[in-house]
From Swiss-Prot:
It is found in: Cytoplasm. ATP binds at residues 185, 204, 220-228, 269, 305, 431. Monomer. Its cofactor is Mn(2+). Binds 1 Mn(2+) ion per subunit. HAMAP family: PEPCK_ATP. Keywords: ATP-binding, Cytoplasm, Decarboxylase, Gluconeogenesis, Lyase, Manganese, Metal-binding, Nucleotide-binding. This is Phosphoenolpyruvate carboxykinase (ATP). GO terms for cellular component: cytosol. The lineage of its organism: Bacteria, Pseudomonadati, Pseudomonadota, Gammaproteobacteria, Alteromonadales. The gene is pckA.
Amino acid sequence: MADGLNRVHFNPSTAQLVEFALLRGEGELTANGALVAKTGARSGRSPGDRFIVREPSSEAEIEWGPVNQAFDPGAFEGLWARVEAYLADKELFVSDLEVGADTEHYQPVRVTTQYAWHQLFARNLFIIPEEFNRKDKPVWQIINAPDFVCDPARDGTNSDATVILNFAERKVLLAGLKYAGEMKKSMFSVQNFLLPAQGVLPMHCSANVGKDGDTTLFFGLSGTGKTTLSADPKRFLIGDDEHGWAPGGVFNIEGGCYAKCIDLSQKNEPVIWDAIRFGTVLENVVMDKHRVPNYKDSSLTENTRAAYPLEHIAQRKEDNCGAEPHAVVFLTCDVSGVLPPVSILTKEQAAYHFLSGYTAKVGSTEIGSTSAIQSTFSTCFGAPFFPRPAGVYAELLMKRIESFGSQVYLVNTGWTGGPHGVGKRFDIPTTRAIVDAIVSGELKDVETVHLDTLNLAVPVAVSGVDSNLLNPINTWGDKALYAEYAQKLAEAFTKNFAKYQVSDAIRNAGPKA
């Protein structure tokens, strides 16, 4: 894309990008100063349109299938060239950014976008380095052309839009998509492929650190509480979604947060609330006539979002890094109402539940989801983003846990007293009290009760939590019905886990069907 043929804005500031977005009709300002943009029909990720170029350098290391769909190298070259030609006479926005807040494990990336608000999103979510690419690594390229219309017959895509990763050429192509989350998740997938070869575990998790330097990780799918629980006024945020765990410490892969906004309240989520101001991008958030965001309005999508830089959070770890974690929390949203609010896991149970990734899609981030809430097993708590076989990541997790001695907990942010529609969801204050007990060390070496069917150890008391909530059978009026649902869930775990080749110790660490 030659600079002389179009107007190219290099490393534009936040204020410039907001001005461009408003002048070009890409969005509107809200009363709190944020820029709100709409993404149209695709208000979430499009997993059916995501591909990886099948080429010799990476072919043998990728787990090909419905998640990692193969794309022909020649077809990619043709489509990349067509998109470049399409953008040749367009006004463009370009930034040199980095992915990975670690001096050894970062990846430099040049992001070219057709929309100003997409560039603002990229500058909020990726890292703006003081000095770009200090180690002179080969630079990745992202091109995002949302107004380009793909032709499946001509381009080899599945629809009029696509996301394609090319590891050999270090290129990411996004075409026909306005949903900005595709940009951040594409580079997350890149790091998820590259980091294991460097002995680093990439993780779909949030992370924070206490005043004494103790790090806690929160794994979970979108909507299970990663962002909410890591944004703790008593602790310092490292990041809310993507991290690497290397020998010696953890680091944020990003430079910002991408928080779900549905039902956001100042009372329950003050850190996120205060971060939404000038420079923040709001996706698909509805405003009233006074331009005040209505976070309860899901008329455009359940998957409303706020994208803001970490600088918008007062209590944050400024280097985006932390020590190795003392506590690791697996967040599961159990729609059956069977799992306890907190369980203490052995390292074998940690491997079992990491591979299982049992949870729910809560206001799914994927387009085409027919139900707002549905149970799912998502390997590594992020199956759509991990190109390598699941065992690679599970082995790295076990290695890191054993090496450092981290304690792993399973925390249910879903339902109790009955399944979704009958029981009630654990409220945020209850889950926060549980997390407080975890990070304080209160739950180490405590008295527990064993739930035989689920094969889980549950503490008999947690400060600030009604003890009746801790054993889920106590919250069900019909105890026999609870036992029936628990057995069904155990059978679902066993059926899902049958595909994994693991040791007997790990297999036997799961529920007992």
